[in-house]
Structures are given as structure tokens and as C-alpha cells.
UniProtKB/Swiss-Prot annotation:
GO BP: anaphase-promoting complex-dependent catabolic process; cell migration; cell projection organization; cellular response to amino acid stimulus; cellular response to oxidative stress; COPII vesicle coating; embryonic cleavage; endoplasmic reticulum to Golgi vesicle-mediated transport
UniProt xrefs under PANTHER family: CULLIN
PTM notes: Neddylated. Attachment of NEDD8 is required for the E3 ubiquitin-protein ligase activity of the BCR complex. Deneddylated via its interaction with the COP9 signalosome (CSN) complex.
Descriptive protein name: Cullin-3
Record keywords: Acetylation, Autism spectrum disorder, Cell cycle, Cell division, Cell projection, Cilium, Cilium biogenesis/degradation, Cytoplasm, Cytoskeleton, Disease variant, Epilepsy, ER-Golgi transport, Flagellum, Golgi apparatus, Intellectual disability, Isopeptide bond, Mitosis, Nucleus, Phosphoprotein, Transport, Ubl conjugation, Ubl conjugation pathway
Comp. bias (Basic and acidic residues): 682-698
Location of region: Interaction with KLHL18: 2-41
Length: 768
């Protein structure tokens, strides 16, 4: 359609010549102007506008409005447009219902828009004056409303348009190629016909489109679930979401993206979350078992789109993780290696840290769930604190196979993660103190730096109160080294001899070290006892008022041992010879690294060939439990450790059993370390009960100290509030039970540190 011409040009056409108009207009003249304008509007609608003059038409419309005939012009315009749309346009569209419907409607819409732009330009003055004053729709919008009501929303056209669009989209979803441009034009038309709103587009297309889509996706989800594994299903859902977004971009209005994606998410994800997650041989557990980080990442990404999606995943993951963790901590049984036990937990943590980082976007919910699960199952086993300490002990001892200091550091950092999950940190501290003492006293620490690094980690985690005793142990070692240097200088200066004994004494501060107040008895052999007495006199001369108590259970010794192998008779048979009577090529010398108790037992055999269990007990005075353990190490261990033989050859040690030196003892090593039976497996049951008793005693004091601290500051408190406050203060070390706290409160009331108030027995006051 060509534009209106800007003037009459060289044409001799006088029909449209502008004449001067009178100041007042009679009806006849008004009608003639309207007829002229009406004819021009109809010509524009028929696309015959080439001979029309824009100026003349504008001036005529201006004249009508100026002389208060705007209403006639506005009403006339509405009637002309309505008539054209009903009689011509609607008929054309109705005739095309079964043939080229969308193309016909689109063409009619384009023609109508073009015509209305031209008509608006002619009637611009009416828009500015009459429309503004009377608060009616402007010319262009009036044209849109009439087109909407008389064409697009006309009964069967409206239904046919909706159905056509829905059918085309349904066909495209099945893989057919459709005219996307026609769909896009129709959707744009519906949006424009909403006049600044979405109502027409929403009611005539979007709502039924979303409804149809929901049904389609419902069917699709059933098909996908029946035919695919979880990972393939997830990929198909992702593809479906992307396809729907792409369709919106190219065919529909952008505002439809959010609602259609929500429909896909609801029908393909939300309604089937549990089914997808719990799919046998392909769901979340399968992915976790087989380390499928990529598939887990896809599931996380998809489930993060819907409400409770990640919660559903988390619950399933948590259930699997707890099952794995419980299996690890309950597999303990007899002979479970503490290092393997902790390594198993660390490996499990590493696996789930990898999932957290690579699959779950370091999500806070997953992070908290994993931490909560580890705390849950780690604390199911009361031996976890001891085993963690033994694990660290293993890493900080000399002779760790090929690990650099940096690798040890990394392992210790991982161990600290488990330590954070531990509720009984005070139990760990007690064991750590024992194991550190053993490392320091046997000179087995891999390095002072590594030890101090570990203490620094514990200090950062629990504060200096937790590590003050451990740091005190290091100070004692340093002071002991200085003391021993001074002692050796003293021996040189005085010429005093230790009788061939190379003595090293560590003076330990009671309270820092795991010393025993009731020290186990032990009759130390004369030579080492004499050497120690010389040291005692030297030390007490320097430090008057101090007392030295030997801690036999913490000592060690290197013994020079000579074994006389079997001697052959003339007939070729062999006879075992004990003692030091025979020398020859069969003599083998070793240095035996033993505990103080083992040294005391072995040195008896310098005096006699055989001893019964009762005789050894009588001679050494070692407590029965310690004696049995020492003899088992010497007579029942591996062949390369068996320096004594026992009759009968059983694992148990009882009265009447006879012990002799094993002269057939051989070892490839010159220096032989005699392992203490069960030391690597942690404490025996009686020892564990004893440790637990000590921990409980310590806890009583800690709970009472916390109660007094709180009451001193608050003066008056209700029972439940006090219990909560005490728990809060102590939870970094252990979780005291309310029953134990109540007992400690009662103990403090008896000792008159606290008192109950007369009016309420559940309220306590501090007694200064």
C-alpha cells in the first residue's frame, strides 16, 4: 500500500482542492466534509490511497474537531472500520478456515495495521484534542479493539486460531517441521491486541498452551521413565527444557518462557523426584557407588530447579552415607587395625568431598548434611577417639613409608576434619597424651616440627587450655636433655662409673604426662638400678625438695643379647645349649629394644636357664596383667620376635608354664624391636575401662568448674538454664548429659558452693 501523497503536485485534479471555510459550519457542510473523510478512509482500507492528499484530509478533520464535531468524526470512524472488518475482513478469514487460515489472518492483520497508521495520521488532531478531552481510546487503539472483537475473538475464528497454533506446536514437538514465522506473527498479534497487557495472548493462547503442554509432558514423563536410566532421563529432561526455551524465543512471546519451563519442571521433575533418585541400578546411590560425578552434577543442576529437589537428593545421599559409615565403624571386631579404621573414614570423606566439589557445587545443604552424617556415625563407636590418636601416632612416628613432611601434613589436616566431628575430644586428648609421650620417650617422632604443627592444629581448634599439657611435655623433654648433658659432665668430673649402663633419664612433670600415681611395682635389675641411684642423688642435690618416682611402664631399654645356636653331635643330631658355656660359629649377637618390664624379665635369664611363671612373678614383682603382656610379647609373638620359649606352646600364660631362652632365635635385623602385644590394636578392655574411669573423673571436675564459673557470674539461675549453659561451655570438649550435670549440682549444694532458693527448689544461688 503506497503512502498518501503530500500534495496535488502537477495533477489537474480539482476534486480535493482546499477551500476557505466559514467560521461557523452548517450541518450540510459538516456532512460533506465527513463524506469526504469517510470516502478517504474506505479508499485506504481498499489500498486505493494513491490519489489522496494528506494535507487536505488532515485540514478537513482538523476543521470538524475545531468546530466541535469531533464526536461525529469519532463515531463515524468506528462505524466505517467496524463495517469493513465485519463485511470484508472477517468474511475472508472465515472463508480460509480450511485453507491458508494463518496466512490469511496474518495478511488481514498486517493490512489493518498499515491502514490504521494512515488513518491515525489524518486524524492526528482528533487524537490530540477530542480523544484527550473525552478520555476515549485513540484512533489506532480503537482500530485494534474493533479488529480484536470483530475478527480475532469472533467465535469460530478464535477457536480455530487457538487450535491451529496448538496443533502446530504439538506437531513440532513430535519432530515435524512447521511454519514458525506464522506462529510468531499470530502470537505478536495477540500481544498487541492486549493493549499494553497480556490478557488476550494469555486467554486465547498461553493458558490452553500450558494446559496442553502439561498433558503432553505427563505422557512423556511416563514414557521416559519406563524406557531410560536415571542419567539418560535427566539428559532428556534437560533437552526438553532447552527445546521449550528455544521455541519460546523463536515462536512465542518471551513472557511465556517462565511458565512453560515451570510446567516442564513440575511434570518431568517435581512429580517424579523420588522415582528418579531411587531408580535401581541407575539412581543416586548407583551414581555415588560408581563415582559418577558428571551424572550427579546433572542431577544436582536439574533438581536445584524445583522446590525440595535438593532436599530429596540430600536425604537419599545421607541415608547411603550413614549406611556406609555405620558399616565402617561397626566392622571393628577383634583385631581391627585402628589405622585402617581411620583411613577408611578418611577415604569415605574424600569421596564425598569430591562429590561436594565436583557435583554439588559446594552446596551448603549438602556440606552440612555430610558433616552431620560423619558426626553421627563417627560417635557411634566409643573407640573412635583412641583410634584417631593411634592413626596420628602412626603418621608421626619415624619410619613412615616414603612420605614427605608435606604429605604427612596433608594427612594430619584430613585427620583434623574427623577430630572436629568428634564429641569426646577430652577422650582423644587423654589418648593423644599417651601416644605423644610414647613417641617422645622412645625418640620415635618423625620430627619436632611435625609434632609441633599437630599441636598447633589442636590449639587452633580447641584453644590453649587443650594443648597446654602437650606443650609442657615438649618443655620437659628440652629440660631433660640439658639435665642429661649436665649429668654426663658431672660423671666425667667426678669419675663416677655407671657400671657399663648407658643411662638416659627423662624427668617428667606430674600432670603433663600420663604418669600413674600408683606406679606398678617392678624389681629393676641391680646394674640399671645402681645407675639410676647415682642420677637420683645428682638431681636431688640440684633440686632440693623435689621427689622422683620411677614410671616403669613408660621406660625402655636396649639390651645386648647373645644367642648360642644348636650344636651338632658326632652322629649329626642337634642339641640346644643354653647359657654362655659354648662359643663358636653359631653365636649370634643382637640388640633387643624392649620395655622396662621386658628388660627386667630377660635379665633374670643371666642367672638361670629356666623360670616358671610364678618364679618370674616373685622375682620381678611386676603386676600380673603387665607381666602376662610382657611374656606374651617375648614368648608368643612372631618367630622373629620370640626370644623366649614356653612350655606348653599355647598363647595363654598360666601358673606352672616354664620359660627358657630361645637359643634358636634368628632375625635378619641386628637391632630387634620387641613389639608389645596388642599395642597397635589400642587398649585392652580392662585398660579401656580404666581410661574411661579417669575421663569420667576428669569430667566431674570440669563440669563442677563450669557450674561454679557460671553461677559466680550470674549469682542466680534456674536449673534448665544452668544445664543449657554448662552444656554450651563444655561441648567443645565433650557432651555432658543433663543427668551428670544434675549430680554435680547436687554435689556442689552438699559442699555449700550453691544453695536452692526457698521459694523455688529449681532455682539456685551462688554461695560466696
Amino acid at each position: 500500500m503506497s503512502n498518501l501523497s503530500k500534495g496535488t503536485g502537477s495533477r489537474k485534479d480539482t476534486k480535493m482542492r482546499i477551500r476557505a471555510f466559514p467560521m461557523t459550519m452548517d450541518e450540510k457542510y459538516v456532512n460533506s466534509i465527513w463524506d469526504l473523510l469517510k470516502n478517504a478512509i474506505q479508499e485506504i482500507q481498499r489500498k486505493n490511497n494513491s490519489g489522496l492528499s494528506f494535507e487536505e484530509l488532515y485540514r478537513n478533520a482538523y476543521t470538524m474537531v475545531l468546530h466541535k464535531h469531533g464526536e461525529k468524526l469519532y463515531t463515524g470512524l468506528r462505524e466505517v472500520v467496524t463495517e469493513h472488518l465485519i463485511n470484508k475482513v472477517r468474511e475472508d478469514v472465515l472463508n480460509s478456515l480450511n485453507n491458508n487460515f494463518l496466512q490469511t489472518l496474518n495478511q488481514a492483520w498486517n493490512d489493518h495495521q498499515t491502514a490504521m497508521v494512515m488513518i491515525r495520521d489524518i486524524l492526528m488532531y482528533m487524537d490530540r484534542v477530542y480523544v484527550q478531552q473525552n478520555n476515549v481510546e485513540n484512533v489506532y487503539n480503537l482500530g485494534l479493539i474493533i479488529f480484536r472483537d470483530q475478527v480475532v475473538r469472533y467465535g469460530c475464528i478464535r477457536d480455530h486460531l487457538r487450535q491451529t497454533l496448538l496443533d502446530m506446536i504439538a506437531r513440532e514437538r513430535k519432530g515435524e517441521v512447521v511454519d514458525r514465522g506464522a506462529i510468531r506473527n499470530a502470537c505478536q498479534m495477540l500481544m498487541i491486541l492486549g493493549l499494553e497487557g497480556r490478557s488476550v495472548y494469555e486467554e486465547d493462547f498461553e493458558a490452553p498452551f500450558l494446559e496442553m503442554s502439561a498433558e503432553f509432558f505427563q505422557m512423556e514423563s511416563q514414557k521416559f521413565l519406563a524406557e531410560n536410566s536415571a542419567s539418560v532421563y535427566i539428559k532428556k529432561v534437560e533437552a526438553r527444557i532447552n527445546e521449550e526455551i528455544e521455541r519460546v524465543m523463536h515462536c512465542l512471546d518471551k513472557s511465556t518462557e517462565e511458565p512453560i519451563v515451570k510446567v516442564v519442571e513440575r511434570e518431568l521433575i517435581s512429580k517424579h523426584m523420588k522415582t528418579i533418585v531411587e531408580m535401581e541400578n541407575s539412581g543416586l546411590v548407583h551414581m555415588l557407588k560408581n563415582g559418577k560425578t558428571e551424572d550427579l552434577g546433572c542431577m544436582y543442576k536439574l533438581f536445584s530447579r524445583v522446590p525440595n529437589g535438593l532436599k530429596t537428593m540430600c536425604e537419599c545421599m545421607s541415608s547411603y552415607l550413614r549406611e556406609q559409615g555405620k558399616a565402617l565403624v561397626s566392622e571393628e571386631g577383634e583385631g581391627k587395625n585402628p589405622v585402617d579404621y581411620i583411613q577408611g573414614l578418611l577415604d569415605l570423606k574424600s569421596r564425598f568431598d569430591r562429590f561436594l566439589l565436583e557435583s554439588f557445587n559446594n552446596d551448603r545443604l549438602f556440606k552440612q548434611t555430610i558433616a552431620g552424617d560423619f558426626e553421627y556415625f563417627l560417635n557411634l563407636n566409643s573407640r573412635s577417639p583412641e583410634y584417631l590418636s593411634l592413626f596420628i601416632d602412626d603418621k608421626l612416628k619415624k619410619g613412615v613409608k616414603g612420605l614427605t613432611e608435606q604429605e604427612v601434613e596433608t594427612i594430619l589436616d584430613k585427620a583434623m576434619v574427623l577430630f572436629r566431628f568428634m564429641q569426646e575430644k577430652d577422650v582423644f586428648e587423654r589418648y593423644y597424651k599417651q601416644h605423644l609421650a610414647r613417641r617422645l620417650l622412645t625418640n620415635k617422632s618423625v620430627s619436632d616440627d611435625s609434632e609441633k604443627n599437630m599441636i598447633s592444629k589442636l590449639k587452633t581448634e580447641c584453644g590453649c587450655q587443650f594443648t597446654s599439657k602437650l606443650e609442657g611435655m615438649f618443655r620437659d623433654m628440652s629440660i631433660s636433655n640439658t639435665t642429661m648433658d649436665e649429668f654426663r659432665q658431672h660423671l666425667q668430673a667426678t669419675g663416677v662409673s655407671l657400671g657399663g649402663v648407658d643411662l638416659t633419664v627423662r624427668v617428667l612433670t606430674t600432670g603433663y604426662w600420663p604418669t600413674q600415681s600408683a606406679t606398678p611395682k617392678c624389681n629393676i635389675p641391680p646394674a640399671p638400678r645402681h645407675a639410676f641411684e647415682i642420677f637420683r642423688r645428682f638431681y636431688l642435690a640440684k633440686h632440693s625438695g623435689r621427689q622422683l618416682t620411677l614410671q616403669h611402664h613408660m621406660g625402655s631399654a636396649d639390651l645386648n643379647a647373645t644367642f648360642y645356636g644348636p650344636v651338632k653331635k658326632e652322629d649329626g643330631s642337634e642339641v640346644g645349649v643354653g647359657g654362655a658355656q659354648v662359643t663358636g660359629s653359631n653365636t649370634r649377637k643382637h640388640i633387643l629394644q624392649v620395655s622396662t618390664f621386658q628388660m627386667t624379665i630377660l635379665m633374670l635369664f643371666n642367672n638361670r636357664e629356666k623360670y616358671t611363671f610364678e618364679e618370674i612373678q616373685q622375682e620381678t614383682d611386676i603386676p600380673e596383667r603387665e607381666l602376662v603382656r610382657a611374656l606374651q610379647s617375648l614368648a608368643c609373638g612372631k618367630p622373629t620376635q620370640r626370644v623366649l620359649t614356653k612350655e606348653p606352646k599355647s598363647k595363654e600364660i598360666e601358673n606352672g608354664h616354664i620359660f627358657t631362652v630361645n637359643d634358636q632365635f634368628t632375625s635378619k635385623l641386628h637391632r630387634v624391636k620387641i613389639q608389645t602385644v596388642a599395642a597397635k590394636q589400642g587398649e585392652s578392655d580392662p585398660e579401656r575401662k580404666e581410661t574411661r574411669q579417669k575421663v569420667d573423673d576428669d569430667r566431674k571436675h570440669e563440669i563442677e568448674a563450669a557450674i561454679v564459673r557460671i553461677m559466680k557470674s550470674r549469682k542466680k539461675m534456674q536449673h534448665n538454664v544452668l544445664v543449657a549453659e554448662v552444656t554450651q561451655q563444655l561441648k567443645a570438649r565433650f557432651l555432658p548429659s543433663p543427668v551428670v550435670i544434675k549430680k554435680r549440682i547436687e554435689g556442689l549444694i552438699e559442699r555449700e558452693y550453691l544453695a536452692r532458693t526457698p521459694e523455688d527448689r529449681k532455682v539456685y544461688t551462688y554461695v560466696a
